[in-house]
């Protein structure tokens, strides 16, 4: 198994969403440092802003459903062209959000690449036929899956796993890879992680701030309600500050409003703005491993 991180630049439109939500996180983090306590409303605003920051790393489409500013889906198409140079090669593409796969579907359709889409809303009676098609149909070369849809799947007839985004909990990342890199896999597995440069994703990657499964239910969408207290809240806030650089942001731009603002989910992106010049993604092979981990 080889793991590779591909660093992808952000467009100005993406950065606007990301940074506005980062300011919300910074204000709530400042309140936490003053009072060592957050209301449930503040905790909900915090988790919403964190999710918005992560979604903006993929595309503005996930936030406004009108525009599609972002390079990740295009970089994926380039990567798949390389993968498909090997006869019969297939790829499994994961994202937490079905909106990411909606963007990808457009790129696949433009290139007439056949695929299946697997998510939590797929009826159980249809799941078997989708998996069988991906396994047996030589024309179907891409398996798109959300985390909710991918639980328990065996997809070892593919040898490439592509993560469009990083889950908060590294155990979820390993579960994704484990759909392909598992007992009985005879081929070398290539794992590619797309990371948005200069964003919360880079902070998550470098600091491993959310290493413990303590926060999985809160930040991976499994918890219906968000409520932390005591030691769990303290550890959570410490990780948030590390991953987002909230403390540094406040030192540079002190918040004048001491109350936490709402998360930004629909302003400005639809306005006319120059598209950033597309830059080549920077790749880094950061880890190789043999055998199952």
Describe every region a protein language model picked out.
Residues 24-32:
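Cytochrome P450 catalytic domain signature, combining two hallmark sequence patches
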Residues 28, 53-59, 183-186, 211:
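Conserved, well-folded catalytic cores of nucleic-acid-processing
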Residues 1-23, 141, 145-225:
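SF2 helicase/translocase ATPase core recognition
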Residues 1-22, 34-143, 147-151, 222-265, ...:
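Conserved Helicase C-terminal RecA-like lobe
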